[in-house]
Amino acid sequence: EFALMVNDFEILKSYLDEGANGIESDITFSDEGEPEYTFHGVPCDCRRWCDRSVGIGEYLQHLSDLTTPGNPKFRENLLVVVLDLKLNGLSQDALRQGGLRLADKLAAHYWTGNRKARAYFIISVPKTSESEFMRTFRKELDEINFGDMSAKIGFDFTDNGDFKETQKVYEGLGISEHIWASDGITNCIPLLLRGTDRLEDLTRQRDEPGYKYIDKVYAWTYDKETSVVKALELGVDGVMTNYADFVIKVLNKPEHSSKYRLATYDDNPFEKFTA
């Protein structure tokens, strides 16, 4: 599960204390494409404080401490970090610069030379038209000799678009693994209105033998038991929520615990699950 809008240290500690094994953080950029802060702003999900923020370098360093075995701050349950990139309005040049600079920031502040920090990252881009960000991000990792860290990186587009079109974009980027697909809407709108047709399509596509362009499917934002149970029934790999402890309680109910559990570090977030 992913705790949503984890944009400062206080809320990060709170969610980890609740038992979350994944977090989603919002990353803002300057007009030139420089990664600057964790910040969502208004509007955001209902019943949430939208203005939490911390500098990107400081945030990545803190995540590094939390996910490095042997560090006094190490939190064993934190496995996956979704970086929800706020790229709206950036030019293609700025997108290219943004991908390059985010790779640099991860190398400088998260892996910091020793590469012992063990979290996986999902680079979550809003629109397929912003795919240049992914291209330069991957290229820069190679050029700064952090290409081996690609094993810890996955990708996701969050525009709820036609996945056949999304597949073409991935093909153009040369990406055919470590792909997460998502479907969702703000918690202010009931799941009943959103429906689950697209989510069902994604899980069906994921499970097609030999299909390479979806490894995992997650749903957002699921804050009610009926929604979480529906997601489990559809076979999703993860849910984003504002209430991590609540989702864990649902998972631990006898009717679910025999079939589902929270992922641990022994599970690979880029491998398809087979029952």
UniProtKB/Swiss-Prot annotation:
Binding positions for Mg(2+) per the UniProt entry: E24, D26, D84
Supply one GO CC term from the record.
extracellular region
Q: Name one GO molecular function term.
A: phosphoric diester hydrolase activity
Q: Which InterPro entries match?
A: PLC-like_Pdiesterase_TIM-brl (IPR017946)
The tissues where this chain's protein is expressed are given as: Expressed by the venom gland.
Q: Which SUPFAM superfamilies match?
A: PLC-like phosphodiesterases (SSF51695)
| CDD domains documented for this protein | GDPD_like_SMaseD_PLD (cd08576)
Q: Does the keyword Magnesium apply?
A: yes
The UniProt entry annotates the active site at: H40
Please give the superkingdom of this protein's source: Eukaryota
The coenzyme or cofactor needed here is: Mg(2+)
E.C. designation(s): 4.6.1.-
Q: Where are the transmembrane segments?
A: none
Q: Which keywords fit this entry according to its UniProt record?
A: Cytolysis, Dermonecrotic toxin, Disulfide bond, Hemolysis, Lipid degradation, Lipid metabolism, Lyase, Magnesium, Metal-binding, Secreted, Toxin
Localization (cell) = Secreted
One GO BP annotation is:
killing of cells of another organism
UniProt remark on cofactor binding: Binds 1 Mg(2+) ion per subunit.
Q: Which reaction does it catalyse?
A: an N-(acyl)-sphingosylphosphocholine = an N-(acyl)-sphingosyl-1,3-cyclic phosphate + choline; an N-(acyl)-sphingosylphosphoethanolamine = an N-(acyl)-sphingosyl-1,3-cyclic phosphate + ethanolamine; a 1-acyl-sn-glycero-3-phosphocholine = a 1-acyl-sn-glycero-2,3-cyclic phosphate + choline; a 1-acyl-sn-glycero-3-phosphoethanolamine = a 1-acyl-sn-glycero-2,3-cyclic phosphate + ethanolamine
Q: Which cysteines are joined by disulfide bonds?
A: C44-C50, C46-C188
**Family stated for the protein in its record:** Belongs to the arthropod phospholipase D family. Class II subfamily.
Function of the protein: Dermonecrotic toxins cleave the phosphodiester linkage between the phosphate and headgroup of certain phospholipids (sphingolipid and lysolipid substrates), forming an alcohol (often choline) and a cyclic phosphate. This toxin acts on sphingomyelin (SM). It may also act on ceramide phosphoethanolamine (CPE), lysophosphatidylcholine (LPC) and lysophosphatidylethanolamine (LPE), but not on lysophosphatidylserine (LPS), and lysophosphatidylglycerol (LPG). It acts by transphosphatidylation, releasing exclusively cyclic phosphate products as second products.
Q: What is this protein called?
A: Dermonecrotic toxin LspiSicTox-betaIE4i
